[in-house]
Amino acid sequence: MAGRVKWVTDIEKSVLINNFEKRGWIQVTENEDWNFYWMSVQTIRNVFSVETGYRLSDDQIVNHFPNHYELTRKDLMVKNIKRYRKELEKEGSPLAEKDENGKYLYLDFVPVTYMLPADYNLFVEEFRKSPSSTWIMKPCGKAQGKGIFLINKLSQIKKWSRDSKTSSFVSQSTKEAYVISVYINNPLLIGGRKFDLRLYVLVSTYRPLRCYMYKLGFCRFCTVKYTPSTSELDNMFVHLTNVAIQKHGEDYNHIHGGKWTVNNLRLYLESTRGREVTSKLFDEIHWIIVQSLKAVAPVMNNDKHCFECYGYDIIIDDKLKPWLIEVNASPSLTSSTANDRILKYNLINDTLNIAVPNGEIPDCKWNKSPPKEVLGNYEILYDEELAQGDGAERELRNRPGQPVGPRAGRSRDSGRSVLTTWK
């Protein structure tokens, strides 16, 4: 039956096509009857647009949710997380607890961020509280480090404004929306270099939320040693880890591509910081990923024809606190090294094993919850049905003195939540 699956893609990457061909699937065009379409975010917009009026049949599935941008657009991700915090606060959830300075104890995992031009005055007010801070500015809808720059003076933004006297922000080239965030200027360094984590997370359904973590993530390193010096603010080889930028650096290594496996990072941290501290760090990373998904779940169009593999970008500071930087809807499938090619081939293979019933035609009624033995390098990160089914959340949430936050422990293998007291 596997040979009957008809596939289409508008992303010509060998790691995709080789996986489809290995399964004996048949390539067709988008105008023919197809069962599986691995598409770009531009195409998914057209497929689900009101104008197109395209209706997917039960034997058709696609690799994006219709409004994935609620998570993957930088401004909307922050907006949804802020809304989620306020909702938990209204409900009196222990997760929304704050310290004496009004800072969230457990939900402070995204750098302070403002939308421009909308929040320009709020940003200026915050900037003046800490005039020595550095901020990073990013266009909302771009990837691969495009259009990003760092600032440490208000005048650097006013240069972009047609009329700085009005304190309004207007880009000279377009009126494109930007986010501006406090720059994490104390990143954890290895070999003196800044790095971030790229982690892959597969969501098979948002309601109920079920997500999987891919165990083979990696670290991306800058090619130039880090310095917070203001003289290097414009040097993106110091500050941005994106391979699309670093590969143009003089010191870029084409053999390892400036990458480390997450397992190597874990071993390094265990040897330098200790096993307990390292385990706590990774528990916190898993916890904030699930919180970000819970933040967008209510607004996500949970179309049964969809699944999505996200690329999460996490930065760890020198106090071993993880920060969610952004989420990518189409993490790069370009292979920069031999190891990269193997990793991404296996990522697609394991993703297909969850999205499509084994040896069968795609079926939107399939719950995308296969037995553990076919998960490959994925492991269940959170399963809302199992978490609610055992009744543990409500009981633990009501117990006085019950620990909350990412330190409270997890049970990923059972499919229960990373945090025992989650909402």
Curated annotation (Swiss-Prot):
List of residues binding Mg(2+) 1: D313, E326
Region of interest: Disordered: 390-423
Annotated binding of ATP, by residue: K138, Q144, G145, S181, V182, Y183, I184, K194, F195, D196, T241, N242
Species, as recorded: Mus musculus (Mouse)
Protein's UniProt keywords contain Ligase: yes
Protein name: Polyglutamylase complex subunit TTLL1
Binding site for Mg(2+) 2: E326, N328
Gene Ontology molecular function, alphabetical: ATP binding; metal ion binding; protein-glutamic acid ligase activity, elongating; tubulin-glutamic acid ligase activity
Residues annotated as binding a protein: Q144
Record carries keyword Disulfide bond: no
Subunit field text: Part of the neuronal tubulin polyglutamylase complex which contains TPGS1, TPGS2, TTLL1, LRRC49 and NICN1. Interacts with PCM1, CSTPP1 and LRRC49.
Pfam family membership, one: TTL
Domain notes per entry: Gln-144 is the main determinant for regioselectivity, which segregates between initiases and elongases in all tubulin--tyrosine ligase family. A glutamine residue at this position is found in elongases TTLL6, TTLL9, TTLL11, TTLL13, TTLL10 and favors glutamate-chain elongation, whereas an arginine residue is found in initiases TTLL2, TTLL4, TTLL5, TTLL3, TTLL8 and favors initiation.
Family: Belongs to the tubulin polyglutamylase family.
Catalytic activity entry: (L-glutamyl)(n)-gamma-L-glutamyl-L-glutamyl-[protein] + L-glutamate + ATP = (L-glutamyl)(n+1)-gamma-L-glutamyl-L-glutamyl-[protein] + ADP + phosphate + H(+)
Role played: Catalytic subunit of a polyglutamylase complex which modifies tubulin, generating side chains of glutamate on the gamma-carboxyl group of specific glutamate residues within the C-terminal tail of tubulin. Probably involved in the side-chain elongation step of the polyglutamylation reaction rather than the initiation step. Modifies both alpha- and beta-tubulins with a preference for the alpha-tail.
Residue ranges constituting the TTL domain according to the UniProt record: 1-367
Effect of deleting the gene: Knockout mice exhibit a loss of axonemal curvature and beating asymmetry in tracheal epithelial cilia, resulting in a reduction of cilia-generated fluid flow in trachea. Knockout mice exhibit accumulations of exudates in the nasal passages and sinuses, rhinosinusitis and otitis media, and also emitted frequent coughing- or sneezing-like noises. Knockout male show abnormal sperm morphology and function characterized by shortened or absent flagella and immotility, and male infertility. Partial loss of tubulin glutamylation, probably due to redundancy with other polyglutamylases.
